[in-house]
């Protein structure tokens, strides 16, 4: 059975630059508004999908809309995305041996650069449907709190 880990990196992850000039990736996301908020879809927010397109690693939406993104922002975002993926791979590995990684979900397009300790990275057909499958098979949990007055008894 493969080990599965969900990562907060997706196509709608917001890209920013902090006060020190450091590029940030997430944790906030445009979520399901990706197709209206991302630059490549005519929006005004820089997302990780825009970085993929600006890097020439994906052809989604209007490529011309990301030509003005500064190269240092693109490179910084790619480095940060790679750091996030690298950390996840290292956290999941049980030995130093190289592994094969299977990426699914909307954020799987974020894989752009080689990862240390990974011999092969697979992004299967229909990879973006994994989010729907995950939501469909998720276990639902809940908690009920009942209070009972010891003097008067249960009052439901």
What do these predicted ranges mean?
Residues 1-156:
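Helical "lid/coupling" subdomains associated with nucleotide-phosphate turnover
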């Amino acid at each position: 059975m493969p080990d599965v880990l969900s990562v907060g990196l997706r196509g709608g992850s917001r890209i920013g630059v902090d006060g020190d000039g450091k590029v940030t990736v997430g944790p906030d996301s445009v979520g399901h508004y990706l197709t209206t908020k991302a630059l490549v879809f005519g929006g005004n927010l820089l997302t990780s999908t825009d970085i993929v397109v600006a890097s020439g690693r994906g052809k989604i939406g209007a490529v011309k809309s990301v030509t003005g993104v500064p190269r240092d922002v693109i490179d910084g975002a790619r480095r940060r995305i790679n750091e996030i993926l690298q950390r996840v791979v290292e956290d999941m590995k049980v030995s130093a041996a190289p592994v094969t990684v299977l990426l699914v979900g909307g954020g799987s397009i974020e894989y752009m650069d080689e990862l240390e300790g990974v011999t092969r990275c697979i992004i299967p057909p229909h990879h973006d449907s994994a989010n729907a499958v995950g939501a469909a098979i998720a276990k639902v949990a809940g908690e009920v709190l009942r209070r009972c007055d010891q003097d008067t008894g249960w009052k439901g």
